Amino acid sequence: MKLRNLLLTCLLLVSAGVSADAFEEPVFSCIRDMTPVRGFYIDNLLGDLEATKAVAESEEGGTYPPGSVIQLVPTEVMVKREKGFSPDTNDWEFFELNVSEQGSEISTRGFEDVVNRFGGNCLDCHEKADPQWDMVCEQNHGCDPIPLSALMVRAIQKTDPRCEAVPLSDEEMAALQALSGGAGE
């Protein structure tokens, strides 16, 4: 009977197009290898990038499909899990990463209790998004503003240590210096 239940579970996962392995040990690499959309990056762990992109680019919002990956900065990731997995987070799992030239290491992952390196609880911010945006924050989605300008975000994205180096503009360099507390002289 146990074998039968195991086989049924495997069959259900395969028929639903959900790969449990994709969620168990997700691999997060260079943010710029993902698909850019209005200043953030998207992907899909299950290969359904077109469905993820359709929601991300929609002017009306929508519900992201399972496997959707969203990143604004290299060290923070949201992954959409299968429907019903975590109703309190709208099925989003939050990740805090340590990134280096060698790759990514998951520092923290979870649902309601993930706190980023600046002390902010991921869910506390994302749950403020208007319902049609499926907990994804942008400037006009209902979330509290983050203390980073678009220029700062772009500079942070360009300096992801997992990526091939790209030149920074003088403005981007000044933005990074301002972030690190430098005078920008």
Residue ranges and their predicted role:
Residues 47-61:
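N-terminal post-signal-peptidase region of extra-cytosolic proteins
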Residues 5-14:
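Sec-dependent N-terminal signal peptides
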Residues 21-39, 61-185:
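Sequence context surrounding c-type heme c attachment/ligation sites in exported
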